[in-house]
């Protein structure tokens, strides 16, 4: 991405303290009298260089005083950021998304999926090449983690993968596009009414996706039944409509969509309300048809308090249309409701080692013993580097 001089960090950092007397002009040749106007102009210049970011970057920096903006520029003028290298800015962006989600005590926080759940989905799906769709993409966590996974294998995620997303809330879609940009990823994200997955297949991807990953909103009601039916992607039929000709709970619409988007060897992984595993009526009928396909692969029960805005438990579902023949009549169930690490009073997560342990169960189920053996070797290496208890105690006493 080419950045004009006026959009470069060094230029902004070295501006005079009093912008009003600097005689600066924006890209449209208007006078700029505040640092906020200068930063807004920088955002506009960046958008001109990137079709993906057009209309996405914030343009309200004039809401902040010059003193606050100057201090922020100074804080990020830190040689430590350059020395660390790698995807530092991307990780900083993720950190603030995380903090933002924690401070939203409502369903508005559904734009953010906890990282340990995203990692679990990506680790089991193991994306390599092809089309990845998230039809409820929020801030894009599935794309970021998938990109990291592919890059870690020595490939270039932008060359190997094509990322597509739908997100009804335009603000969340902007978060997603910025998140992808700072992580060096490109993708096609649709937002607004045309991206309402209940009524639109915005990218025309039914039957074409190698991978589908999502954390859809749970238990959505008042979905217009006729409009949803006309939008298709319902290989197992429609959930029952109520007297108002609405779908009272859309969980099985989502589940049907995730299956319908897959190609003949595609894999899907998604978060779902725990209640969907045993809901009755038309949901049960759809679930029975789904199981009979032989493509349900893994189900993981997750405990309470994994979300910032919800305390209820959830489940992770996985489909695999390319399952080995000997696994076609099998589904792996993992009860991980009591397996977690407490972060604080209201939040739990899976640590890296807990993720590896859960992943190991899936490998053994699939007969991938080489991956399991490699993990054992990793365990042995880490344990071999551990400091003996007596030595650790001595070090602790010396520090005290």
Describe the residue ranges of each PLM region.
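Short, functional N-terminal and low-complexity linear motifs
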Residues: 36-42, 57-63, 84-90, 141-148, ...
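Conserved S-adenosyl-L-methionine
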Residues: 107-214, 219-230, 237-241, 252-253, ...
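Short amphipathic alpha-helical segments, especially helix-boundary/capping motifs
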Residues: 46-50, 66-71, 93-98, 150-155, ...
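A conserved structural/catalytic subdomain of Rossmann-like adenosyl-cofactor enzymes
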Residues: 206-400
């Amino acid at each position: 991405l080419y950045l004009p001089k006026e959009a470069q960090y060094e230029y902004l950092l070295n501006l005079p303290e009093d912008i009003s007397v600097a005689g600066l002009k924006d890209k449209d040749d208007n006078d700029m009298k505040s640092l906020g106007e200068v930063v807004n102009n920088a955002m506009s210049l960046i958008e001109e260089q990137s079709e993906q970011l057009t209309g996405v970057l914030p343009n309200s920096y004039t809401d902040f005083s010059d003193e606050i903006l100057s201090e922020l520029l100074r804080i990020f003028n830190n040689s430590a950021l350059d020395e660390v290298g790698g995807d530092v800015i991307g990780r900083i962006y993720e950190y603030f998304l995380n903090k933002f989600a924690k401070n939203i005590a409502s369903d508005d926080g559904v734009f953010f999926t906890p990282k340990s759940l995203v990692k679990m989905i990506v680790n089991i799906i193991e994306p390599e090449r092809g089309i990845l769709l998230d039809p409820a993409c929020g801030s894009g966590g599935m794309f970021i983690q998938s990109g990291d996974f592919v890059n870690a294998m020595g490939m270039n995620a932008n060359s190997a993968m094509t990322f597509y997303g739908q997100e009804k809330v335009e603000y969340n879609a902007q978060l997603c596009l910025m998140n992808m940009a700072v992580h060096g990823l490109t993708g096609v994200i649709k937002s607004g009414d045309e991206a309402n997955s209940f009524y639109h297949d915005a990218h025309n991807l039914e039957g074409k996706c190698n991978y589908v990953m999502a954390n859809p909103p749970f238990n959505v009601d008042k979905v217009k039944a006729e409009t949803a039916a006309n939008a298709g992607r319902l290989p197992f039929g429609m959930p029952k409509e109520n007297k108002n000709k609405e779908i009272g709970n859309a969980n099985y619409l989502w589940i049907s969509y995730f299956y319908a988007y897959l190609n003949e060897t595609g894999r899907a992984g998604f978060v779902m309300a725990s209640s969907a595993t045993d809901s009755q009526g038309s949901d049960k009928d759809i679930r029975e048809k789904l199981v009979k396909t032989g493509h349900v692969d893994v189900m993981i029960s997750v405990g309470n308090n994994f979300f910032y805005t919800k305390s209820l438990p959830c489940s992770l579902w996985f489909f695999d249309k390319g399952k080995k023949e000997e696994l076609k009549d099998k589904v792996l169930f993992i009860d991980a409701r009591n397996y977690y690490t407490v972060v604080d009073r209201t939040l739990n997560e899976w640590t890296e080692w807990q993720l590896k342990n859960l992943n190991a169960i899936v490998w053994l189920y699939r007969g991938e013993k080489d991956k399991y053996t490699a993990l054992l070797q990793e365990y042995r290496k880490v344990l071999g580097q551990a400091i003996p208890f007596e030595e650790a105690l001595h070090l602790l006493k010396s520090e005290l």
